[in-house]
């Protein structure tokens, strides 16, 4: 059964800027483009992230946040988007632009656990409707897999119609194509990743620990001896109240999700 932890809400703005301005601001040439992904304070403590990418004469920016975390924090999605747009890193990039589109989209992010029945009698399910959104943090595949599954569905449908059999069995070529083209194997291989990545410690606790370590190591100590890395790590884990056993367990779970 799906919960608010398995779904995210994306809200996006498309802002018009002339091509010359885009190329100048983002140091682009010809058909080049750029994509930025953001984590941290831009989502105000809500689990998720934000993005910005260029198009030919527009740029798109938005946030994608977990439904359960959004409800818990009692934050409106458009407030997060406005906060992101006003961030000192982002504001100069969108300055002078004109809003031409606003959209929202529910994103299935539970991976293997929420894949739908792909074929039935006279029916094929593709894209988000089938749960084919591959969001592991390390890899983000939404549009790509929607295109891949749509193409596979079209080919399977044509094959079934030519054979005169549009039953679930006659449409089995759809699943076969998704297997052969690596879509379904990816979901199986990284089946543990979505829950690990969207966990509270990965989204909240450990980023705080990492930034604390960086501050201890990189910030000037005002004449005091500089810290070595291991004492800085130990001190930050102690400050955050994270026992070493918990860290080792999370490293093991992260390895299972991504490493082997």
Where are these regions (language model features)?
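Central beta-strand plus flanking loop segment that forms part of the substrate or channel wall
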Residues: 1-31
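C-terminal auxiliary extensions adjacent to catalytic cores
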Residues: 197-260
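Short, well-ordered beta-strand elements
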Residues: 59-66
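Gly/Ser/Thr-rich active-site loops/lids in small-molecule metabolic enzymes
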Residues: 4, 8, 142-155
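FAD/FMN-dependent oxidoreductases across multiple families
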Residues: 40-47, 56, 69-149, 162-168, ...
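Rossmann-like NAD(P)H-binding beta-loop-alpha module
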Residues: 23-48
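Active-site-proximal substrate-binding core of FAD-dependent oxidoreductases
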Residues: 133, 152-205
């Amino acid at each position: 059964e799906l919960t608010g932890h398995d779904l995210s809400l994306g809200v996006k703005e498309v802002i018009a800027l002339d091509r010359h301005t885009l190329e100048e601001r983002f140091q682009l040439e010809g058909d080049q483009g750029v994509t930025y992904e953001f984590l941290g304070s831009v989502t105000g403590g809500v689990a998720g992230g934000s993005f910005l990418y260029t198009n030919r004469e527009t740029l798109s920016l938005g946030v994608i946040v977990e439904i359960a975390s959004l409800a818990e924090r009692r934050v409106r999605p458009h407030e997060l988007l406005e906060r992101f747009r006003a961030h000192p890193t982002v504001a100069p990039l969108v300055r002078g632009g004109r809003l031409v589109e606003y959209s929202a989209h529910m994103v299935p992010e539970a991976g293997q656990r929420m894949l739908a029945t792909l074929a039935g009698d006279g029916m094929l399910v593709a894209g988000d409707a089938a749960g084919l959104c591959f969001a592991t943090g390390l890899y983000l595949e939404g549009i790509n897999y929607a295109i891949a599954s749509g193409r596979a569905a079209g080919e399977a449908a044509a094959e079934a119609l030519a054979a005169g059999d549009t039953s679930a069995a006659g449409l089995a070529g759809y699943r076969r194509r998704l297997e052969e083209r690596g879509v379904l194997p990816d979901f199986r291989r990284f089946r543990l990743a979505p829950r690990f990545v969207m966990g509270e410690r990965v989204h909240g606790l450990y980023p705080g620990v990492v930034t604390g370590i960086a501050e201890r190591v990189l910030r000037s100590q005002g004449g005091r001896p500089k810290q070595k890395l291991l004492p800085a790590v130990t001190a930050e884990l102690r400050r955050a109240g994270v026992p070493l056993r918990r860290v080792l367990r999370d490293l093991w779970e992260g390895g299972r999700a991504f490493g082997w």
